[in-house]
Design a protein with these regions (language model features):
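Short, glycine/charged-enriched hinge/interface segments at domain edges or termini
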Residues: 1-81
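Short glycine/threonine-rich loop/turn motifs
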Residues: 47-171
Length: 171
């Protein structure tokens, strides 16, 4: 008999988590078959306090900073929360950073990570992370990977941006 291995295991785990989230009633498939959060909140207009949860040493963070500076987006205060964005310890690190951000009196949180392989981005498909995102009081934008990348974090967030820099434009 044949067994899925490698990327096949990841795909099976992804589908299983999608099914659990649908069964729990917190996410459902849209007309295109993409899983989306039930009850997604609208993004605040002209947010004054924006949290950015990402690795402060990442290219994604550098790109976000450059986008903020070049866009003249100086009406908002940006508060950064450093976290791991890859590896087995990343989900717990992201959950901790999101907890800090959610209690910081922000108008919106951006969860950001640049592109990478399916394995590199896998931490954003963690069930505990998904449940943390669903529990946030603060609206959240998931800006993980590139346009072709899709994660559970995208599904359970209030808004998905196709890239970290696009999240600034989406504000």
């Amino acid at each position: 008999s044949m067994k899925e291995a490698g990327a096949g295991d990841l795909d099976a785990a992804f589908r299983a988590l999608c099914a659990r989230l649908e069964k729990a009633g917190v996410a459902r498939r849209n007309i295109n078959g993409v899983l989306q959060k039930v009850g997604a909140r609208p993004m605040p207009r002209l947010p004054k306090r924006v949290g950015i949860v990402t690795s402060l040493s990442s290219a994604a963070f550098a790109d976000i900073k450059q986008r903020i500076e070049s866009s003249g987006y100086f009406l908002s205060k940006f508060i950064c929360f450093d976290t791991l964005v890859q590896g087995k310890d990343a989900p717990a690190s992201i959950i901790e950073a999101l907890s800090l951000a959610d209690n910081a009196g922000l108008d919106v949180i951006i969860l950001a990570r640049g592109g990478g392989s399916k394995e590199d981005l896998w931490c954003f498909n963690d069930e505990n992370l998904a449940r943390k995102i669903l529990s946030l009081k603060t609206p959240i934008i998931s800006a993980v990977g590139h346009e072709i990348d899709y994660s559970i974090s995208d599904s359970v967030s209030d808004h998905r941006s196709i890239t970290p820099t696009a999240a600034i434009a989406d504000l």
